[in-house]
Every structure is written in C-alpha cells, then in structure tokens.
Amino acid sequence: MPLRVYNTLTGSKEEFVPINPGKVGMYVCGVTVYDHCHIGHARANVVFDMIYRHLRSKGLEVTYVRNYTDIDDKIINRANRDGVPYNEISERFIKEFDNDMARLMLQLPTFQPKATEHIPEIIALVQTLIDKGFAYQSGSDVFYRVDRFEGYLKLSKRNLEDMQAGARIDVDERKEHPMDFALWKGAKPGEPYWESPWGQGRPGWHIECSAMSTKFLGETLDIHGGGKDLIFPHHENEIAQSEAASGKPFVKYWLHNGFVNINSEKMSKSLGNFFTIKEILESYDAEVLRFFLLSAHYRSPIDFSDQNLKEAELGLERIYKALAGIYERLASGANTPAGADNAEFVEKVAGFAGRFGDAMDDDFNTALALGHLFDLVRVINRELPTASTGLLEQAKAEVAKMAAVLGICDSVPAAFLQRMKDRKTSDIEMSAEEIEALIAERAEARKAKNFKRGDEIRDLLLEKNIVLLDSAQGTTWKVK
C-alpha cells in the first residue's frame, strides 16, 4: 500500500507524494539549548527519527534538517543567572542534547544548523519581508504584519479577530497590531548582538527556522515536523514568513506528535512532574525508553509512568528472549527438515514484512506494527524447539529489518538481557548469578520431588522482592 500521512494543514490522511520523485526534504524544529532535555523532547526526536528511518527503508533519499536555536531570551537569562557568556550555555547544552539523542539511538540528521551561523540569511529574509510590505521597522525592532498575510492561522484553524478579542495582551506601542510578532529584536545593554540594517540586535525565534529550512531544502518542503505545542505560534508564524517571502506554499505535509502526560497529568514544572531524559535514564535503559515512546501512535498522547515503563521493559525483553532463543538454537547445530515446519509459523514469517510495512505506511502506526511483531514472537517461542534452521534464519532476518526501522533490538540479545538483569538486581542484595543459581537448585529439588526445598527457595527470593514465573519453557524471574 502507498504511504499515507496525517497532514495537520488539511486535517486528513493523504497519500505521501514527494515534490521530487524519490527524494524527500524534511525539517524538524530542534531544541532551544538552555537546559537539559525532558521526556517531551525525547518523544518528538524519537518519533521523527522513526519517520526518517521508515522513509529511507522505502528507498527514498531523505535530506533531514534539525536545527539548534542557540540564541534566545531563555539562553540569555540562563547565562546571566550563571554569570557566563551566552554561547557557553548554548554549547554546553548542545553537547548534552547530542549525548541524550545518541543514548536514545537516533541517527544523525543530514544537517544540524545553528541559528547564530545563519545570521546573514536571517537578515536577508527580514529585509525581503520589509520590501514586500509584510514587515516594518519600529525603533530597532522589526515586526511582522499578521493582518497583511491572508493565510495567517490556516494551520491552527484559529481566527485572528477572535484571538485578539479574547487575548489579554499588554498594549505595545511599537506594534501596529497586538498579534504582530518580532522578526528582529534590538539589543538591550549587555546582550549579544549582530549588526543589521536596523541597528544592533538578534533574530526572533520564528524567523530562524524559516531562514534555515529554506536554505537547506528550498522554498517548499515535503515535510515539516514538531510537537503539537509548536503549531501555534511557531509553525503558524513560519508559514506567514516563508510564504510571504517566496509567494509559494511553504510545506506540503505538516506532521505533529502528541503530548506526553505524567501519570495521566499534563507535564509541567509547576506540578513537579517534570523529568529530564538524564533523570529517566538513571532508572531505565535507554532502549526501553525508546521502545516505550514508540509503543503508542505518534499523534496520540502517551502516559509516562513507572508502570508503563516497566511494561515496555517486559515487552522489549520478550523480543530479545525470542531472538536469544533463535541464536542459541542456531548455534547448537540442531536441524529440522523444512517440510516439518508448522504452517502458522511459515505464514507468520512470510507475511510479517507485509503486515509490518502496511502498519508503518498507515501514518507510521508503530503500535500496530509492534502488535504484528509480538504475534511473530509468540509463534517463534512456541515453534523454536522444532523449527527448521532456514525458517529461524528467515525469522531472525525479518525481526532485524523491522528493528532497523524502529531503531530497537540493536544489542546482542544475551548482552541486553544480562544488562536488564544487572539493572534489576542493583537495588537488591543478590546478583543475577546468585538468583539463577537458586533457580537451578530449585529445579533440581523439584525434579527430585523435594518440594519443601523448592518452596523454601521460592519464598526466600520472594522476601527479596524476586518473583519466579514458571512456564513450559522453564523458570524466569522478575523484581516485584
């Protein structure tokens, strides 16, 4: 099936047809680098990394641009608070961001421009808007005339008059209209600045993205992405700037990811439920966090909680255990004739790529795609002892292709599972090896019908919050 995406601009799913056949230009708004990144940043960046991977898996040549906003009021305020130059703050948190994204296994974008490296392009774009009558100078500032652009608010489906009537906006004598926004800000004493035709100053937030996206991708982009919180005002203002300057549509497909809630409440610093990526990764493996973020459809809200992270951990372990089983079986050299393979397993393996691809082509439905993967894992676990080597190799290859699109299961299965065991036992007084030894002793006791000793071992482990799970495949354990 063809790839279909939900376009925020039209409010509907549309077939994705690149402007230039075989090539895709994608711009995603990056972070303002003044502090550590939080779980909301993690979701947006993991989502668009997944989209980038899927587009490339379909044979498309993708130019992916993700910027850094490295000059902004928040950066200046943080620098003043810490008593350091603004660029010391921005460079520090660019490195922090890059480290967070590497841990979450993001592929590098094609370009990662910084706003401060594109001041000439920004100044030229502001001048174009002034020349065309869409912007005006007021003192050392330059503002955009929102009522001059006919398509203003077409992305957010708002009404300018209603917004003006309902808004509590302080009167700003510098502006012609209360909703006009800054393209260029005159420098205040002690602030960083650049020379411009309007005096010393720095760019506004919105103009940076218009200038950088068009420099690297041209006047019309295939995809522009970001969180839903950016629809207004940021993306709305980007459209106004870019289309007024070029006279052409700015973006063909607008994609926006949903919010992250914390224990069913909106995340906010004021509620005290604000978590940085670094804080989360102190308690959970980075791959588990990535898996969790992809477990829901990217446009849906997702609820961050310890329970949901633990469920994601168990889900990822199920996949890795199935892969570990395949590796062990293949390493054993045992073989079964292909003709003896279970028909359901043959069908699940043969049809997996199509089902997974169809789910991903339906507006990047990772939740459905993972459902198909768990169907395959279930059959792998059941048929592992008797399946032919060829079918197991095929199953392993199919899972690897899926994993490459989602950016998961990149570790050696045994190493990942050991990492999980070590993490789980870090807060208890027993190592994974000691637990496994007791499980082996319990199995021998039960085999010898010494059920009393078996129960003693079970109870001993339970006292240390370790729960044993018996199944036909053997005994596993988890921390309560």
Swiss-Prot record:
Chain sites annotated for binding ATP: 269
Pfam families xref list: CysS_C (PF23493), DALR_2 (PF09190), tRNA-synt_1e (PF01406)
Catalytic activity: tRNA(Cys) + L-cysteine + ATP = L-cysteinyl-tRNA(Cys) + AMP + diphosphate
Keyword tRNA-binding: no
InterPro entries for the chain: Cys-tRNA-ligase (IPR015803), Cys-tRNA-synt_Ia_DALR (IPR015273), Cys-tRNA/MSH_ligase (IPR024909), CysS_C (IPR056411), Rossmann-like_a/b/a_fold (IPR014729), tRNA-synt_1_cat_dom (IPR032678), tRNAsynth_Ia_anticodon-bd (IPR009080)
SUPFAM superfamilies noted in UniProt: Anticodon-binding domain of a subclass of class I aminoacyl-tRNA synthetases, Nucleotidylyl transferase
GO MF terms held by the record: ATP binding; cysteine-tRNA ligase activity; zinc ion binding
Compartments (UniProt record): Cytoplasm
Gene3D superfamilies: Cysteine-tRNA ligase, C-terminal anti-codon recognition domain, HUPs
Record text on cofactor binding: Binds 1 zinc ion per subunit.
Cofactor: Zn(2+)
Residues involved in Zn(2+) binding: 29, 209, 234, 238
Main location: cytoplasm
GO biological process assignments: cysteinyl-tRNA aminoacylation
PANTHER family membership: CYSTEINE--TRNA LIGASE, CYTOPLASMIC, CYSTEINYL-TRNA SYNTHETASE
Family assignment from sequence similarity: Belongs to the class-I aminoacyl-tRNA synthetase family.
Name of the protein in its database record: Cysteine--tRNA ligase
